[in-house]
Amino acid sequence: MGDWKGMIDVSGFINTYDNMIEFSFGFYNPSNGNQIDPYTSAGLAELIYVQQTLGYTINQIIGFGAQNVENARITGVELSFNSMGKIGEVEVVSLIGYTYMNPVSLNNEPKYSVYNSDSTTNMLKYRFKHLVRADIEAVYKKWSFGVSNRYNSFMRNIDKVFEEPIAQNTYILPGLKAYRSVYNKGNLVFDARVGYQINDTFKVSLIANNVFNSETSSRPGDIQAPRNFLVQLAMKF
């Protein structure tokens, strides 16, 4: 269209899994590999038995274990828009992408969802429903200016043990439940950059990551880096 070129791509996907394996954090009986639910009287009794009678330490009991969630299905849609063109003497390039996913377990047995932080949904753990990526760059003579952003929606389901006490007031990650109740709108981060093409070989850039110093976490306990600046010298040969 005139001096502009663009491409739109739309695709859908359906992935089905039989005997799907997920790693679940919790308590396990080392003698048989079964997961222990410390939030029930039977599970608490088994936990005490494993420690006091069988002699296993807490480090041998707690951790990630492979669990069979039976059947699962992940459906979704991906959209992308790429364009390039000129506004006067300024060349503009844009890349925009969006992904929607609906990752669900098809197993309705309560014993599989009881270890989830939200047992009211069959959404698989540690998944995002919405992902957005965008990048726009403008080039004027030897100068270039760019802005990018990334967004992921709130991770609704995680392992229950990260939010609930494992024994009275003992938490693995103290304060995580309150943190997630406040930061429940997803993560949105913006980056910016400015560059100067010195010659055909060298280009110097100033890059600002997390421009607005947003506090984000991709998964429990993994706080992402605050605002930071980088000076980059690139050599093309």
Predicted regions and their residues:
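Gram-negative outer-membrane beta-barrel transporters
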Residues: 13-16, 30-161, 203
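Short glycine/proline-enriched coil/turn segments at helix->beta-strand junctions
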Residues: 6, 138-143, 198-200, 235
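A secondary-structure boundary/capping signal
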Residues: 9, 13, 207-208
